[in-house]
Amino acid sequence: LILDELKTLDYYVVFGVMNAADFGSAQRRTRLIFLGSRDGEDLRLPEPTHGKVGSDGRKPWRTLRQALDGLDDPEPAFAALSPAAIKVMGHVPPGGNWRDIPSGIQRQALGKAADSWGGRSGFYRRLSWDSPTPALTTNPISRATMFVHPEEDRPLSIREYARVQGFPDDWIFDGGVRDRYMQIGNAVPLAVSEAIGAELRQLISHRKASSRKRKGIIACADATLIERFNARPRTVLNPQRMREVEGLAEARKWMASLGGSTREPLDVTVLDEAA
């Protein structure tokens, strides 16, 4: 729907997945990014500056240790883990998670998640100093997405969270602890914003007439992303509040009215072919 609307408006659009760690952020946060030009200008997604191992002229991914280096946070503000969670976290080393909990107390610690969601690595997760963090969430003590400090039995503090997201130390967040975690967790990593801004600034400063109109064209920066989307079946498993029908039988009828589970291929081109 997004792509159809942008094409109707005659925008030239490029899109693709960007990992914040590839642009200097200390977190592995992948997001689908769209850039659009009403004038059909030659937009490009920025090229990564960092890589997991640092090769091909790219720097290695930044680690949590690097992100928090020199942080002055003598009285950190953070959400409190429950006494039970603190007791369990005593068994989890830096970089570990629920799999490090002794088998004798693992099921009790996980509760119902032992049967349903126990495979998620976010349960009782203690961060590693020597790698980027996973994508920050709005609640670092949620059972399935914990962000526990590598050495202390607490989640990352507000200021540590902000450092990982790229905010300067003097940036002010309003509200209580929960509100501030939410503001930071919902933000776009500053490294990604900066990379996109630099790409757009370069485009504007080198603006020149194009021999080919690109208005109304939708281009994807990654051909494999198009293949993955087209191979994915249409599903009825939307969140309950978003479902238009109730019950499996009615859902199947609704799907059949739309042509079944087969998804219509994306009407997009690969970026190099649009240039």
Model-predicted segments: where are they?
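S-adenosyl-L-methionine-dependent DNA methyltransferase catalytic core
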Residues: 5, 31-275
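Conserved Class I SAM-dependent methyltransferase catalytic core
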Residues: 1-37
